[in-house]
């Protein structure tokens, strides 16, 4: 549908001012947006992608569930992202059986149920919400202290957007990715099925992020084309492991 915007605009009697906004875009994506909308010499504003209050963690645990249980604290608003509805329900069920005030959220639930789960999380009636990426679009809960990815996302853009739901109040918050070889195998299989070359390139960037020994914050900022990137942020898994 985005690709049809220029056709629509061209049919108007007078071309209006066209403005485009996005939360996360690499230099290549920004160039593509300008081409798709046929923007001629646009005024471009790119703000910093750096969120100094966020700690970025990367872990490859032997047992993801055991590690997840260690990370979750009582009365600490936490979002756990999983890649599939089945995984969401499975993980949430295990948390509930451990006495954790948690509920799940995905697009397979009715609008009424989704609305109820959102309200329970926003008003602190539950501590943890386990969700697919269907959660969070338009949801702004400022005091989320942890965003934990139980599975590796398919691309860095998705990861950054989802992790960015932590610490919107400006207070310290943690973004932790738990990944394993199984995540890589499943994601590669799914992308290959769709014969998506661009998707595979993005997935490989995500895998590189998981395996890099450089500063995680610097890796992401570099990916989004930000300049003046610190070599050592002192606030991610890799930088702290150097100490």
Regions found by a protein language model. Give the residues of each.
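Helicase motor core with emphasis on the C-terminal RecA-like subdomain
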Residues: 1-201, 226-230, 237-238
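Cys/His-rich short segments
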Residues: 202, 207-243
